[in-house]
Amino acid sequence: MNPLIASASVIAAGLAVGLASIGPGIGQGTAAGQAVEGIARQPEVDGKIRGTLLLSLAFMEALTIYGLVVALALLFANPFV
């Protein structure tokens, strides 16, 4: 294996995980803050807000998992070799 390709794959894997987690991390923090604010305003709709929050957090977390899958593919099933 070419050492240049191997090192570029490791750097690309790190960037894939790092960049794939920035957006969902910011989004999850914003969504959780807004959910807490909404529950504080209207405590009677607590269950509905919490359910919607958990569903949206799962969709946001999927983006980070996709970045992890790309990184694992670059590290262990390198298509550039």
Swiss-Prot record:
Q: Where is this site: Reversibly protonated during proton transport?
A: E61
List membrane-spanning regions.
Answer: 3-23, 57-77
> Which is an annotated GO molecular function term of this record?
lipid binding
| UniProt keywords, alphabetically | ATP synthesis, CF(0), Chloroplast, Hydrogen ion transport, Ion transport, Lipid-binding, Membrane, Plastid, Thylakoid, Transmembrane, Transmembrane helix, Transport
Return the Gene3D superfamilies for the record: F1F0 ATP synthase subunit C
Report the membrane topology from the UniProt record: Multi-pass membrane protein
Q: Name one GO cellular component term.
A: proton-transporting ATP synthase complex
InterPro entries recorded? ATP_synth_csu_bac/chlpt (IPR005953), ATP_synth_F0_csu (IPR000454), ATP_synth_F0_csu_DDCD_BS (IPR020537), ATP_synth_F0_csu_sf (IPR038662), ATPase_proteolipid_c-like_dom (IPR002379), F/V-ATP_Csub_sf (IPR035921)
Q: Where in the cell is it found?
A: Plastid, Chloroplast thylakoid membrane
One Pfam assignment: ATP-synt_C
Q: Which cysteines are joined by disulfide bonds?
A: none
Q: Which domain of life does this protein belong to? A: Eukaryota
Does the keyword section mention Zinc-finger?
no
Cite the NCBIfam families for this sequence. Answer: ATP_synt_c, PRK07354.1
* Misc: In plastids the F-type ATPase is also known as CF(1)CF(0).
Q: What does this chain do?
A: F(1)F(0) ATP synthase produces ATP from ADP in the presence of a proton or sodium gradient. F-type ATPases consist of two structural domains, F(1) containing the extramembraneous catalytic core and F(0) containing the membrane proton channel, linked together by a central stalk and a peripheral stalk. During catalysis, ATP synthesis in the catalytic domain of F(1) is coupled via a rotary mechanism of the central stalk subunits to proton translocation. Key component of the F(0) channel; it plays a direct role in translocation across the membrane. A homomeric c-ring of between 10-14 subunits forms the central stalk rotor element with the F(1) delta and epsilon subunits.
Instruction: Indicate the family of this protein.
Output: Belongs to the ATPase C chain family.
- Assembly and binders: F-type ATPases have 2 components, F(1) - the catalytic core - and F(0) - the membrane proton channel. F(1) has five subunits: alpha(3), beta(3), gamma(1), delta(1), epsilon(1). F(0) has four main subunits: a(1), b(1), b'(1) and c(10-14). The alpha and beta chains form an alternating ring which encloses part of the gamma chain. F(1) is attached to F(0) by a central stalk formed by the gamma and epsilon chains, while a peripheral stalk is formed by the delta, b and b' chains.
Protein name as annotated = ATP synthase subunit c, chloroplastic
Native organism is: Chaetosphaeridium globosum
